[in-house]
Amino acid sequence: MKLSGISLWLLAASIVHAGKSQFEAFENEFYFKDHLGTISVYHEPYFNGPTTSFPESCAIKQVHLLQRHGSRNPTGDDTATDVSSAQYIDIFQNKLLNGSIPVNFSYPENPLYFVKHWTPVIKAENADQLSSSGRIELFDLGRQVFERYYELFDTDVYDINTAAQERVVDSAEWFSYGMFGDDMQNKTNFIVLPEDDSAGANSLAMYYSCPVYEDNNIDENTTEAAHTSWRNVFLKPIANRLNKYFDSGYNLTVSDVRSLYYICVYEIALRDNSDFCSLFTPSEFLNFEYDSDLDYAYWGGPASEWASTLGGAYVNNLANNLRKGVNNASDRKVFLAFTHDSQIIPVEAALGFFPDITPEHPLPTDKNIFTYSLKTSSFVPFAGNLITELFLCSDNKYYVRHLVNQQVYPLTDCGYGPSGASDGLCELSAYLNSSVRVNSTSNGIANFNSQCQAHSTNVTVYY
């Protein structure tokens, strides 16, 4: 049938005024801030899982929080050899300002023209420190956790287990102020665990409390080789593309490219915006994200033989406290621990979160495969967390559920919740005895002590 001109016009008009939902996929915007690896600002992951509401006909009985510190300044490095360190970035910034790295300000629409009037916010003297936004993140999270689990807060004082680094302790304090306000000092008992081998299996910095792993630099060479391979693939094309924005005769090195990127991401962490980020394309941000993911996959993560050892002690402690809750062997209901991203990933690996990445099948280092489980941007952004919930449901059975950054991480290896549907829950005994985690839930502490030749300790902590 041949349509008249007026019919075509009416058809076009009706399409314009119709709902757009069927074509929204073509209009999705790329949010680069959600893809900055472990330096990402806090955001919820993209699990598309069940609702975070408490399951119907279930009562919350325990909550366990494993919490990363909030947004921070770059870490310190007195030798200024680490490209991501505050000292290295500070030196690079000065080179941009004094012309040692010569921006071509006469190049039309140079995205670096702002450098003429730019005042750096990254300072070497602030290395390692929690940022103001990091304090706000933790305060707000503390408030939200208290409101969500209010019925469990029925004792006078709560243990706050924290790794010893200042930014972690500060984060724990701000979180506690969010929970208890001015009454924080009276409501908390801070247990500060050293970040060295004296903490043994109680550590919240397992890399440093495992002498065999730390002293022998296990995973260091394989991780560096993975980075070298991948950076040889993706960094040089960025340097070639950006060279035109600098005076002729100056060619960016791959370290220069990484420095520009780190200024971008840390300015985002410190003040939520950065003109340097306009230098990079969406694909390039995803490739930097992959570089971060390689780090946490190979260094104590699921691509390492040591992941279940390093994460298993926490998992065993968690499992023991879940069992005590069921057996009425303890009246503790709230378990709080504050740590680093490098602690959380091995724990999640020991829990079976990354089944597609193994020592036998690690992430490739010659290409970005995009569809893989361990996205550090989603699992351990600044202020990232892992929450474990224990429920007693109307069928008189106990169930477990995990939340990652306040979104349900659906458990698929141990059955279903009381609804009989895939709702992210597992019945407790099935959860503890699932083949993906039973070695950690049952033997994690013993494995850590024996394989690490860890120091014994008389301190008892509860995660």
Curated annotation (Swiss-Prot):
State the signal peptide span.
Answer: 1-18
- Reaction(s) this enzyme catalyzes, per UniProt: a phosphate monoester + H2O = an alcohol + phosphate
Provide the active-site residues from the annotation. H69 (nucleophile), D341 (proton donor)
User: What InterPro entries does the annotation carry?
Assistant: Acid_Pase_AS, His_Pase_clade-2, His_PPase_superfam, Histidine_acid_Pase_euk
Could you name the Gene Ontology cellular component terms for this entry? cell wall-bounded periplasmic space; extracellular region; fungal-type cell wall
Which keywords fit this entry according to its UniProt record?
A: Cell wall, Glycoprotein, Hydrolase, Secreted, Signal
One GO biological process term = thiamine salvage
Which domain of life does this protein belong to?
Eukaryota
What CDD domains does the record tag this protein with? HP_HAP_like
**What the protein does?**
May dephosphorylate thiamine phosphates.
Under what name is this protein listed? Thiamine-repressible acid phosphatase pho4
Lineage of the species this protein comes from: Eukaryota, Fungi, Dikarya, Ascomycota, Taphrinomycotina
